[in-house]
Every structure is written in structure tokens, then in C-alpha cells.
UniProtKB/Swiss-Prot annotation:
It is found in: Cytoplasm. Zn(2+) binds at residues 5, 8, 24, 27. Residues 1-256 form the CoA carboxyltransferase N-terminal domain. Binds 1 zinc ion per subunit. HAMAP family: AcetylCoA_CT_beta. This is Acetyl-coenzyme A carboxylase carboxyl transferase subunit beta 2. InterPro entries: AcCoA_carboxyl_beta, Acetyl_CoA_COase_Trfase_b_su, ClpP/crotonase-like_dom_sf, COA_CT_N, Znf-ACC. It is an enzyme of class 2 (transferase). Pathway: Lipid metabolism; malonyl-CoA biosynthesis; malonyl-CoA from acetyl-CoA: step 1/1.
């Protein structure tokens, strides 16, 4: 089976792409990585948690059920985020990874419930949280309830922080909308993948509202790093070692 690179549009053997961390061997483009593959890249072991919430359609949005079922089939996941507990470099941690193939990781009530529950579990068990974001923002099919997830998850992250515990975020392409306006930017350390798009509204919308002409790359990870919005850009194949080092330092601090 072959897949098409999002940048060079060349057909690539899917197995080869997976082995190369979804990085195109022809042009170097970082293609969007499913949550399960990212977990395989990062962890030695991982136990899924908070995976039992049922589908809800709170405002009876037309065709939402059909789109939801299609997203489940396409992604192989039950929702737009996978949460659980695992080890990275032998360090025990809680992890959430958003799923790009499930409605582009959009935030609905189940996504908010899962991430909130993970933070609460991590706070109770005094564990750090590693979060990978990829999101188009709030899920419009759930109306105002999707926007409420921003405050709910942010409050849980704040309680985790108040307990003196570590939260590291890796923003991946794209991290936009309500995710950027809440938990994606609350990490003690915020890293990103090369070339990731990070922002709230799209470039065209911002230009229309402000009346200004903006640089083409103003929402790129490189622009954000240059202007102090994130802390580091880490190549995908180096992230496991990078996070393991941070977790090891934090473990020494907590136990001291």
C-alpha cells in the first residue's frame, strides 16, 4: 500500500513511511502521525485510560453521528485524543496524544473529559503529563459545550501545576483555535515539531480583522521560537530522548 506525501505529492510505501516516523524520505516533510504510531515511537509501555465515554450529540447537529462514525473508521480510535499512563526512557508519566485522523483532533466534550481526567489522575498520583497537540480547534458540532472544554482542561492543568508537577507540551501541525487558546500553551515547557503551524485563527482571517499584511511564516514553529512563544523545536526522531531527559531531571527534583 502506498500513501501520498502532503508536500511533494509523491507516492510512498506506507510501511517505509511508518518506519521513518512519517517523515517523507524524498522531501523530508513531517506528515501527520497517528496517535498509536506516536506512542510506539515515544514509549516503552503504555496503558490506555479513560476510554469508555460514549458518543454524545448535545445539540442534535445534522449528520454529526455519520461524521463521527466515519472518523472512528478512518482513525481506528474512539475519539480525538488517546490518554493513558506509560514510560518514556524508563520514566513514569501520564500522556495524552491528539489524533489528527479523528476530525483533526477537534475538541468535543469527550476530548475535554479525557484530558481533564488524565490531569486529575496525574495530580492525585503525583505524575508529570506529556501532551501532544494537533487540533483544528473546538468541535463546531457540539456548539458552546465544545468551548467549555477549554476552561475545564485549563483548570485541571492549573491544579496539576499548583501541586508542583511538570507539564510538557509538544505542538504538532496544526495546533490551532481553542487548543492553542488553552491547554496547548499552558505547559511548563513547550516544544514543537519543525514546520508546525501554531496559531488561533488562520492568516487570512487575522489579516481581515487587523487590516495588516502578515509574514507568510508568522504561524510557523520557527517564527514562534524566534519570538519567544515556544521553548524549543525538536526533530521527531529525537523527541523520545529529549523528553526522557526532561522527565529524569523532574523525577530527581520531585524526590529531592
Amino acid at each position: 500500500m502506498t500513501v501520498k506525501c502532503n508536500k511533494c505529492k509523491e507516492e510512498i510505501n506506507k510501511e517505509d513511511l511508518e518506519k521513518n516516523y512519517y517523515i517523507c524520505p524524498l522531501c523530508g516533510k513531517l506528515n501527520r502521525m497517528p496517535a498509536k504510531n506516536r506512542l510506539q515511537m515515544l514509549t516503552e509501555k503504555f496503558d490506555v485510560m479513560f476510554n469508555d465515554q460514549e458518543f454524545t450529540d448535545p445539540i442534535d447537529f445534522p449528520s454529526y453521528k455519520e461524521k463521527y462514525e466515519s472518523a472512528r473508521e478512518k482513525s481506528g480510535e474512539t475519539e480525538g485524543v488517546v490518554c493513558g499512563r506509560g514510560t518514556i526512557g524508563g520514566n513514569d508519566t501520564c500522556i495524552f496524544i491528539m489524533e489528527p485522523n479523528f476530525m483533526m483532533g477537534s475538541m468535543g466534550t469527550v476530548v475535554g473529559d479525557r484530558i481533564t481526567a488524565l490531569f486529575e489522575y496525574a495530580t492525585k498520583n503525583r505524575l508529570p503529563v506529556i501532551g501532544y497537540t494537533v487540533s483544528g480547534g473546538a468541535r463546531m458540532q457540539e456548539g458552546a459545550l465544545s468551548l467549555m472544554q477549554m476552561a475545564k482542561v485549563s483548570a485541571a492543568a492549573k491544579r496539576h501545576s499548583d501541586a508542583g508537577l511538570l507539564y510538557v507540551v509538544c505542538t504538532t501541525d496544526p495546533t490551532m483555535g481553542g487548543a492553542t487558546a488553552s491547554f496547548a500553551m499552558l505547559g511548563d515547557i513547550i516544544i514543537s515539531e519543525p514546520g508546525a503551524m501554531i496559531g488561533f485563527a488562520g492568516k487570512r482571517v487575522v489579516e481581515q480583522v487587523t487590516g495588516e499584511v502578515l509574514p507568510d511564516n508568522f504561524q510557523s514553529a520557527e517564527f514562534q521560537l524566534k519570538n519567544g512563544f515556544i521553548d524549543d523545536i525538536v526533530p521527531r526522531q529525537e523527541q523520545r530522548a529529549y523528553l526522557a531527559n526532561i522527565l529524569a531531571i523532574h523525577a530527581e527534583t520531585v524526590s529531592a
